[in-house]
């Protein structure tokens, strides 16, 4: 992002902080395609395309403003016979420009804010994905109740555009963004459907992720602000909200609506034992307190979404469960707190009595059924978990095929080595190993047995099972590291930067 700062500062001197002129800068599209937007292990980075040039962008934006609205609608086919251009191609070009331009000022605001000690201190509880796993081990054994929350959607993008206007003051840019969303992303309907959101996310992934993450960030900032500053709303720290219209009005309405459901008024409260974790479109709210307070937080979320973001959310979408009786899914794991009961014989003078001791242990389990479903979707096995060949990769060399399977197996192995029981993980490794062998046999037009006997690839494929033990034997001393400990202990790898494609498939 350093080059973003250089280019934007150059544009600032000429255009006075306006984003609209950046749409016509060709280097914006060069920067957009110089980064790897898709982290999928199956998709290669295509690089910068010459079709995304400044001249084409100018022509397309001019054509957008000059087209006849009586002829074109959002439900037209991708190729309009009157204007003779492909709407999907047009949408992709402008979408990349929007995404990269909107990200620049927010990155600069974040980098400038982090230079101030007060801002850093206020965000000291913000952590990366690496801190989630130690948090589960250290904190969850002391908590009693957990609320499984799915962030509501679809949200109309008009609301997102209005929220963006509080942060960026550029009327022409948002006029163009709104026009684009309504006429080329099928957002003409009053209530967007999940199908339209899915189509928009696939055709414009970077812009969709930015808008969605911005919506989540906005909702979390308001939620944390209300939680931390509930008794002293008008503080200096409120300046981070800039000029958010009707914030106090909606906040008062939120309290008013909430107080009608109870015989007495209970204002916003602080719960020192509450913990909040979010990943993708799901969040976990855990607390040590009684279910009554968790139920309070449940309705706070619902009214916040309905009153501030105009998103309808049903109370049944938020479940409150006891940790010792129910498991919850987060980051591709099934987690629960198990109660271990043990009896200890105690003797005092001549009296002997039994004492029952209850201890809590966190169980983190690999979700074998969703993983097999994901592998079946990726054509590594069938729905029953039986390995099959992947003929799509048969055109590659043997080394590339084995390297691809090993990379997938290594990523899944690193991700799920924090589980308490690894039998399910070994089953996934077995599916990938046999699928790799069948793919190689299919390429050489032979059976699995004949291929292994002829090529002697059996030793090479043992890497699917021996790699983890060899690495850990180099890290830990021989006397302390045993295979039994490796099977039982949870090991979190710090190279987990993102969830794999085969994780959290629903």
UniProtKB/Swiss-Prot annotation:
Under Pfam families, the record lists: Intron_maturas2, MatK_N
Q: Which family does it belong to?
A: Belongs to the intron maturase 2 family. MatK subfamily.
What InterPro entries is this protein classified in?
Domain_X, Maturase_MatK, Maturase_MatK_N
Name of the protein: Maturase K
Q: Which HAMAP family match?
A: MatK (MF_01390)
Tell me a GO cellular component.
chloroplast
From which domain of life does this come?
Eukaryota
Which organism is this entry from?
Answer: Trifolium willdenovii
Q: Where in the cell is it found?
A: Plastid, Chloroplast
Instruction: Describe the function of this protein.
Output: Usually encoded in the trnK tRNA gene intron. Probably assists in splicing its own and other chloroplast group II introns.
| GO MF annotations, alphabetized | RNA binding
Write down the PANTHER family for this protein, in alphabetical order.
MATURASE K (PTHR34811:SF1)
Any single biological process term in GO: RNA splicing
Q: Which UniProt keywords apply?
A: Chloroplast, mRNA processing, Plastid, RNA-binding, tRNA processing
Q: Does the keyword tRNA processing apply?
A: yes
């Amino acid at each position: 992002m350093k080059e973003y700062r250089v280019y934007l500062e150059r544009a600032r001197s000429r255009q006075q902080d306006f984003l609209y002129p950046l749409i016509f800068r060709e280097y914006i599209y060069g920067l957009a395609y110089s980064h790897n937007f898709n982290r999928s292990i199956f998709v290669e980075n295509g690089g910068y395309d010459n079709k995304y040039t400044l001249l084409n962008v100018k022509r397309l934006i001019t054509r957008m403003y000059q087209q006849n609205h009586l002829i074109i609608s959002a439900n037209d086919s991708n190729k309009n016979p009157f204007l003779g251009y492909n709407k999907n191609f047009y949408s992709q070009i402008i979408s990349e420009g929007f995404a990269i331009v909107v990200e620049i000022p927010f990155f600069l605001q974040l980098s400038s804010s982090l230079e101030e000690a007060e801002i850093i201190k206020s965000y000291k509880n913000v952590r990366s994905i690496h801190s989630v796993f130690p948090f589960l081990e250290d904190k969850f054994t002391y908590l009693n109740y957990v609320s499984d929350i799915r962030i509501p959607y679809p949200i109309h993008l008009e609301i997102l555009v209005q929220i963006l206007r509080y942060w960026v003051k550029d009327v022409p840019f948002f006029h163009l963004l709104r026009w684009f969303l309504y006429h080329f992303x099928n957002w003409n309907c009053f209530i967007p459907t999940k199908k339209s959101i899915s189509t928009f996310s696939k055709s414009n992934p970077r812009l969709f992720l930015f808008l969605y993450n911005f919506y989540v960030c906005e909702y979390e900032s308001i939620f944390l602000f209300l939680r931390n500053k509930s008794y002293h709303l008008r503080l200096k720290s409120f300046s981070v909200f800039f000029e958010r219209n009707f914030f106090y009005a909606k906040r008062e309405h939120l309290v008013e609506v909430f107080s009608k459901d109870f015989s007495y008024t209970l204002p916003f409260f602080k719960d020192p034992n509450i913990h909040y974790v979010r990943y993708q479109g799901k969040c976990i709210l855990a607390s040590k307190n009684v279910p009554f307070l968790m139920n309070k937080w449940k309705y706070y979320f619902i009214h916040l979404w309905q009153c501030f973001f105009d998103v309808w959310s049903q109370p049944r979408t938020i479940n409150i469960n006891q940790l010792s009786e129910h498991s919850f899914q987060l980051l591709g794991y099934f987690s629960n707190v198990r109660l271990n009961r043990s009896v200890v014989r105690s003797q005092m003078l001549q009296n002997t009595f039994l004492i029952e001791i209850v201890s809590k242990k966190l169980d983190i389990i690999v979700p074998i059924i969703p993983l097999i479903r994901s592998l079946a979707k990726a054509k590594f096995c069938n729905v029953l978990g039986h390995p099959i060949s992947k003929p799509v990769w048969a055109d590659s060399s043997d080394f590339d095929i084995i390297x691809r399977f090993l990379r997938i197996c290594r990523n899944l192995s690193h991700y799920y080595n924090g589980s308490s029981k690894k039998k399910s993980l070994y089953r996934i490794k077995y599916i990938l190993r046999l699928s790799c062998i069948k793919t190689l046999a299919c390429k050489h037009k032979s059976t699995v047995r004949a291929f292994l006997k002829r090529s002697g690839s059996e030793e090479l494929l043992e890497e699917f099972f021996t790699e983890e033990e060899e690495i850990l034997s180099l890290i830990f001393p021989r006397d302390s590291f045993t295979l039994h400990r490796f099977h039982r202990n949870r090991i979190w790898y710090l190279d987990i930067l993102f969830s794999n494609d085969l994780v959290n498939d629903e």
